[in-house]
Amino acid sequence: MSDPTGPLALPGDYTARLAVERDGELTEVGPSRIFRVKPLNASSEISGDRRALQAFQLKVVDVQRVTQGSLRSLNEMKNRLAHLREAITRTPATSREDEDMLSTIQQRLADLSVDFNGDSTVSSRNEAAPLGIASRVSSIYWNSMYSQSDPGGNARKSYEIAKGELAEALSELRAVNDQLVALEASLERSGAPWTPGRIPKLPD
């Protein structure tokens, strides 16, 4: 896990404390200190409303957080599905419906991968491809995170587009996960080998 990052702190007074952690307990070292963060105001483009700027940046941070978490969930679901595919081949009691559901989930995950990452088959042919959610959000994040200027109209519009696309993709991701859980339950009833993400059950 990387170190936490975020937008610049607002000007004002802050309190800092130094502590040592030992055996799970924190012990403060010395008294707390107050320090002041001052704006540089070195450019005419610096925002006159830093609180509003930070509010926008924090919204971008949240969308970035959800995007990264969704991508990890997507990859985890792909891994679960790969193990389920192998489990089906080793379980005679599975049905045609299980195989059909696996194929459906595989296609839905592939479509979600395009939504998040873009279509590499198009870009590899040097053709213009729609921007994936992850690329759009990453661009907004790095262009705004440490900026001291008010976000422009294009930045706000791009944020709203990314947020809308992410909401739709997240809804689909949850729906596919529900279908994946149902497939895992079906294979468990058929006596399939253990697969990641599934706790086996004892027979009655």
Task: Label every model-predicted segment.
Residues 1-10:
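Signal that preferentially marks extracellular ectodomain short beta-strand elements
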Residues 18-20, 33-35, 39, 66-204:
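Mature extracytoplasmic or organellar-lumen-exposed domains after removal of signal/transit peptides
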Residues 21-25:
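Short, solvent-exposed loop/turn segments at the edges of extracellular beta-sandwich modules
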Residues 27-66:
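Low-complexity, Pro/Ser/Thr- and charge-rich linker/hinge segments at domain boundaries
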